[in-house]
Amino acid sequence: MKATSNLLLLWGTSLLSPSSAFVIDNHHYQHPLVVDDSSSSSISPLKIFTSSGPSANKEDAPSYRKNLLSLHKSLIEIPSISRTEQEVGKFLLDYLRNNLGYIAKAQFLEGSSSDPFSQYDDDDHSQGRFNVLAWPSSHNLSSPRVLVTSHIDVVPPFIPYHISTSSESDEEITSDAFISGRGSVDAKASVAAQIVAVEELIRAKEVDPADLMLLFVVGEEISGDGMKTFSVVYNDAEKSKKEELPRFKAAIYGEPTENKLSCGHKGHTGGVLKATGIAGHSGYPWLFKSATEILVKALAKIIDADLGSSERYGNTTVNIGTIAGGVAANVIPKEASAKLAIRVAAGNQATGADIVRSAVDKILKEVDEEAFTMEWAGGYGPVECDCDVDGFETMVASYGTDVPNFEGDHVSYLYGPGSILVAHGDDEGLKVGDLETAVEGYKTLIKHALGA
């Protein structure tokens, strides 16, 4: 038994070792499927949401308001654009350890694949980027059944914190006060609400602290490398033949869902489409081949095509992010390229991306047998999440998350305050009441996931 306990503690320390794009045009396939509000289904990929779910009393401020707003403000005030998350990570380590008394560790991304059991250092953060792992209980770091997680990186540019009150005193702040700044929604609102929710449940003795673990990852807005690192290390430890180790029963992911419980989100694939032509004088286009011309023709067909759809996730949509080509207006271009981001609504998580790729490859051959090269950059199909929880309205998201980056047989829940429609914009923000509603929502989800 002693050997097993030591291994569990070793596993506890060993763990340390792609957004919604609404394309505005008049084509059927570039819009979500319209869902009849009169239907029995409560899932809608189209609606613009309003706050819902278990909510805090909006007349009387909850006892945790001051701590919630203070934590949220501190997180926003620290710039953490993807790949530069170290300072906000240091803040969280200090906050979780010194303010809450949790066990908190840094999980460095570098070197994780070669030696997952020796990649931590609690004090020296010069090793580079790191995830933040925290356990409310120090009794057994390997016993948690529910993972509560979100991301601490944000998109550029940095936007300072602001709250719409004449004073920041507790008396002046109401549930209608508006908080803005980069990350105020995506996803520092979720981070703050999750931490407060966990602490409130523990203080009320509604959960066993040993059942919970917190994970705040880097890199979600770019490649998902933070969650992918955690997944690799976690699953390497789980696959160890030395002893059976406990597995998470559920993972609760924090992302802006307007405090609705997401039933899943579209998948994603994409890459760079390159066209090769024959350069020549622009006065004689029939003698040469314009790379930009055939590229535009192919892109038009891709946008107009039915790349797959489903009742839950709507239509697969395409965003042409960048187009480049040619050297001068009077030269027929030899080369042209475009970067595509495709939100996949067909198939399942394992097959959806392949369905879309096959459809795109077929279109390219129809336009020109030899001119195109498509460099695909990974991908996955629609991601399902559990949304069968009493007290929540539901939705389906068109953006990507870290849900597919954490491999395992756990149940996934996707929920959080704020709207994705402002998440990456200059007007990113949400109301105090939305934050407080999220705290209550996370409390409900945690208790549901634990079967409490």
UniProtKB/Swiss-Prot annotation:
The record's SUPFAM superfamilies line, in alphabetical order, gives: Bacterial exopeptidase dimerisation domain (SSF55031), Zn-dependent exopeptidases (SSF53187)
Residue positions the entry lists as glycosylated: 140, 315
Is Signal found in the keyword set?
Answer: yes
Extract one GO cellular component term from the record.
extracellular region
Q: Which GO terms describe its biological process?
A: proteolysis
The UniProt record gives the binding positions of Zn(2+) 2 as 186
Instruction: State where Zn(2+) 1 binds.
Output: 186, 221
Indicate what this protein is called per its UniProt record: Peptidase M20 domain-containing protein SMAC_03666.2
The record's keywords, sorted A to Z, are:
Glycoprotein, Hydrolase, Metal-binding, Protease, Secreted, Signal, Zinc
Q: Which residues form the active site?
A: 220
Localization per record = Secreted
- Chief site of localization: secreted
Pfam families per UniProt: M20_dimer (PF07687), Peptidase_M20 (PF01546)
Entry keyword Acetylation: no
Using the record, list the residue span of the signal peptide; answer none if the entry has no such feature.
1-28
Its family remark reads:
Belongs to the peptidase M20A family.
Q: How does the cofactor attach, per the note? A: Binds 2 Zn(2+) ions per subunit.
Q: Which organism is it from?
A: Sordaria macrospora (strain ATCC MYA-333 / DSM 997 / K(L3346) / K-hell)
Q: Which GO terms describe its molecular function?
A: metal ion binding; peptidase activity
What InterPro entries is this protein classified in?
A: ArgE/DapE_CS, Bact_exopeptidase_dim_dom, Peptidase_M20, Peptidase_M20_dimer, Peptidase_M20A, Peptidase_M20C
Lineage runs: Eukaryota, Fungi, Dikarya, Ascomycota, Pezizomycotina
Cofactor requirements of the protein: Zn(2+)
